Amino acid sequence: MQKIRKGDKVVVLSGKDKGCSGEVIKVNPKENKAFVRGVNMVKRHQRQTQKQEAGIVSKEAPIHLSNLAIADPKDGKPTRVGFRMNVDGNKVRFAKRSGELING
């Protein structure tokens, strides 16, 4: 089970976007990287196709998972993630800062 998943709210811990938060769009577990909406934006030159015209497009670049932390559901501050068994016997994630369950 992964600590950071698609749809999670995360906070960037280091780099040019330190302190910024956003939603995880995509996670690549083999490379230990994730794409976060609106964070780590880079400009790419787009070649013209039949569907879209040429130009410079801003898109998200991947961020290493070690530079991300889950935002605590209670106050939005970065927290570590723990795992515990639910009453149903399912493994669930929880915020170590507040003890709140992380949905997903």
Curated annotation (Swiss-Prot):
Taxonomic placement: Bacteria, Pseudomonadati, Pseudomonadota, Alphaproteobacteria, Hyphomicrobiales
Annotated protein name in UniProt: Large ribosomal subunit protein uL24
Protein family: Belongs to the universal ribosomal protein uL24 family.
Subunit composition and interactions: Part of the 50S ribosomal subunit.
Top-level taxon in the UniProt lineage: Bacteria
Gene Ontology molecular function terms on file: rRNA binding; structural constituent of ribosome
SMART domains assigned to the protein according to its UniProt record, in alphabetical order: KOW
UniProt function note: One of two assembly initiator proteins, it binds directly to the 5'-end of the 23S rRNA, where it nucleates assembly of the 50S subunit. One of the proteins that surrounds the polypeptide exit tunnel on the outside of the subunit.
